[in-house]
Amino acid sequence: FIFCYVVKGNFDGNYLEFWETIDTELIIVENPLDDPQGWVMDFIPLGLGNDKFGFHSALFYKKPDIYFIGYTTNQSSTKNAFLAVANSKMIINSRSMSCLKYYNMKTEKFDNQINLIDNYNLFSPGNTESSLCYLKRKKIFICTTYDPLSGELSIMTSKKINGPWFGPQLVFKNPDHITMTYSFRIHPSLSSNENSIVMSYITSPDKDIRHDAVDQKYYRPRFLRMDIE
């Protein structure tokens, strides 16, 4: 499964306002172990997700379910993280996310839809581009979170995916931050053991990428390694 944002461009708009998220699309790859150039792919528009709500910021698979840490915007315009779950077989059979359920922190049960936003607040801030991993030996979940306007990158930790989550704990402050620092991801495949994890982030320049040439250190992943005791 590959979950993608569907973005609508408005290239005549103001800088940082020239695009918006309008949907989510699921790509099912039938032969994921083959060379990506030979992938057989099925594209499924899901009709779910926008700038204020998204369900696939971070993923965790526990057969047959996929757990999602998404984001939603509360009344104060702050993004909160929420937990959702869907059965992978039902997603394939229905070609939709109709089976998606949301974890209610108050009742400690999964609901078919979000009613009162505050009841589903897993932690804050929630992000559009974070990441989730589980360290089996240490028996702990780690989820990235960040404030894109401050340049601060942090992590949340929990023994259970439904919480309680502890943090945010600051792990890095981008020394080259100008406008935004974001897309804070964990890359488990780049770590040989659980003594450290490899992460990446992206930083934006103050120039308009539609018209101006920018330094190559911007809009390129930068990598960090964090040791874990």
Enumerate the language-model features and the residues they cover.
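Beta-rich carbohydrate-recognition and catalytic domains
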Residues: Y5-N50, K63-N127, C133-H177, S192-E194, ...
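Beta-propeller and closely related beta-sheet repeat lectin domains
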Residues: F55-L59, T128-S131, M180-P188
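Blade-loop segments of beta-propeller domains
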Residues: F1
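Extracellular glycan/ECM-engagement signal in secreted proteins
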Residues: F184, E194-S196
